Amino acid sequence: MIPRVFIYRLPQDDPRKNTAIKLVRFGFAQLVDSIKALPSGSIILDPTVKTPLTPSDRVIAESRGLSLIDCSWKRAVDVHTKFIRGKFIRRRLPLLIAANPTHYGKPYILSTIEAVAAALYIMGFKDEAMEVLRLYKWGPNFIIINQKYLERYAAGDLSPERELLGVDDVDNGLEQLMRVLTNGD
């Protein structure tokens, strides 16, 4: 059973370009009006935590759902560290490369639709991930760019992160990357 996707959206960008709005409009996600309205016990994608999403998270996502906060990358660290309260299972996505026109080729700065597709793919919902990405002309390019990484992540192998970061200490490398991304977006 495909996980239900819940999104709390902060109006920090152009709504005409917002991928979360399109996910909701086409029935792939449900918009909630506050962080408290996100389901307790759901997996929440949080770029500030150390624990990556893995295929073993599938069971939780199927029963409790997948939650996201749609916000500007410039404010992502503040939003995720200050506002997430409650009983969520916090996971970050493993390192991937953006295919969206705004951040094309940049590591980790994924749009909401890319994040949802990546999570679905990693948890074994590959067809559903492709279906979501087809909402945009550039969407399937996300899979093309990241195919070898997504396949390894979907098999539970997180070693591509070291390869993409070029460091052995993934936690430290991601911390440095987040600092650069949130200051220079």
UniProtKB/Swiss-Prot annotation:
Aminocarboxypropyltransferase that catalyzes the aminocarboxypropyl transfer on pseudouridine corresponding to position 914 in M.jannaschii 16S rRNA. It constitutes the last step in biosynthesis of the hypermodified N1-methyl-N3-(3-amino-3-carboxypropyl) pseudouridine (m1acp3-Psi). S-adenosyl-L-methionine binds at residues 19, 69, 93, 108, 112. Keywords: Cytoplasm, Ribosome biogenesis, rRNA processing, S-adenosyl-L-methionine, Transferase. Its EC number is 2.5.1.157. It is found in: Cytoplasm. One of its GO terms (biological process) is enzyme-directed rRNA pseudouridine synthesis. Belongs to the TDD superfamily. TSR3 family. It catalyses: an N(1)-methylpseudouridine in rRNA + S-adenosyl-L-methionine = N(1)-methyl-N(3)-[(3S)-3-amino-3-carboxypropyl]pseudouridine in rRNA + S-methyl-5'-thioadenosine + H(+). One of its GO terms (molecular function) is 18S rRNA aminocarboxypropyltransferase activity. This is 16S rRNA aminocarboxypropyltransferase. The keyword Ribonucleoprotein does not apply. GO terms for cellular component: cytoplasm. The keyword S-adenosyl-L-methionine applies. Pfam families: Ribo_biogen_C.
